[in-house]
Amino acid sequence: MPNLKDIKSRISSVQNTKKITKAMKMVAAAKVKKAENTVKAARPFSDELLHLFRKMLATVGEYSVAGLHVQRALDNYPELLEKRDIKTEGLLVITSNKGLAGAYNSNIIKTAIARIRANKERGVNTVIYPVGQKAVSAFKHAGKYFELKEGYISIANDPTATGANIIAEDIAEDFVSGHIDKIDIITTHFNNMMSYNVVSWDVLPVKVEQADAHELDPVMEFEPSPHSVLQQLVPMYITNSIYQALLEANASELASRMTAMSAASNNAEEMINTLTIDYNLSLIHI
């Protein structure tokens, strides 16, 4: 049986650990409610933007790049709508900067690695756009079958529309230049405080289903022109898709960390109780 000094030292160590995990749980709990409210408030706008975009594309029809002069890749909407043979796929992989969030980051990274392997098997190259320190670190050591872009670290800490626009411009530039032919986001969908799902959705080329034929919609008129409206709407749609993904990821990460730290605190409490019993038994046998 361990001596009293060793047991007392272990109890003290576990108590210190419990203080840390409990504090981290409280911090995550304080942030996650705000993150939950933000992501849920943003969803109706994203859904309505998608709905509007669907109607516009069905109304406008074909797109021509002739005579279009733009300064930003995001403004080059005809090329952003172009579908071509996929030789290189980009993956925007959204993780957190910190660990101690259960299996949150590892689940996302495993999904991305599986996608890289699937691309390799079908002869498609992969370019990784990592968001968060965990993604940057993981893909630096994950192999050589993909190109790794510079990571977006600060954006993972505080999701904003400005940060989403920075990412959107970078991937739009690579798409328009032909460096990539497609890009998907690998992120999480926040369900509730106890649940999230790792998901993937298309960003470029902009892929919008046509409206159902039986739906009766008013005729759309565009001022000053369809081109000018789409030139504003396409960048908004792409940026908002990325922003929504960042919000979903942030809420999922905080909820996962709160759950993980709650479990760690409970485990620490159980260990303290067990060690306390051992300590008392040792006292009896002295």
For each predicted feature, which ranges?
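C-terminal beta-strand-loop-alpha-helix "lid" module of Rossmann-like NAD(P)-dependent dehydrogenases
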Residues: 1-284
